């Protein structure tokens, strides 16, 4: 089983993350940030990754530290659960429509973190959630997960739909990239011999 448990404690947040890459998409995410929990639920469900996240953060300041630090911990958990990445397909992509929004995700589990973010949300807030934190999450997740991650928005006028399409597209691309290819189950998916 490709699983991981991460705990991360700083002066700003106290986080625990458990994931199972070979799960069915069950989730139990409580960060104190309702909209963010909803996005994490989408990530787990559509990646078919079992996920439990707990975060106690300095929400009296704002949501920034909690969202970014969960991205860090989740990326670390992904790296740990993948191990040497033997047998994975490595690459994934998805173009995902959600009502007015359409977001494309292309990713490579390369070990070379990089984020290309071509997504614009028309509002500064979704409820009480700062929309700029969506990018902060993906930056932290890509950096600590060793993911080359491209997210490109082609359409959308509703910030909630755009954000959700980005999370779901990433989830679907991750699902494909993490899948073990039975033809190369014992091989590292690189001519270098390591990722």
UniProtKB/Swiss-Prot annotation:
Reaction(s) catalysed by this chain's protein: D-erythro-1-(imidazol-4-yl)glycerol 3-phosphate = 3-(imidazol-4-yl)-2-oxopropyl phosphate + H2O
Pfam families per the UniProt record, alphabetical: IGPD (PF00475)
EC class of the enzyme, as a word: lyase
GO cellular component terms, A-Z: cytoplasm
Protein name (Swiss-Prot/TrEMBL): Imidazoleglycerol-phosphate dehydratase
PANTHER family to which the protein is assigned, alphabetical: IMIDAZOLEGLYCEROL-PHOSPHATE DEHYDRATASE (PTHR23133:SF2), IMIDAZOLEGLYCEROL-PHOSPHATE DEHYDRATASE HIS7 (PTHR23133)
Organism (species): Jannaschia sp. (strain CCS1)
InterPro entries hit by this protein: IGPD_sf, ImidazoleglycerolP_deHydtase, ImidazoleglycerP_deHydtase_CS, Ribosomal_Su5_D2-typ_SF
Keyword Cytoplasm assigned: yes
Family matches, as HAMAP family: HisB (MF_00076)
EC number: 4.2.1.19
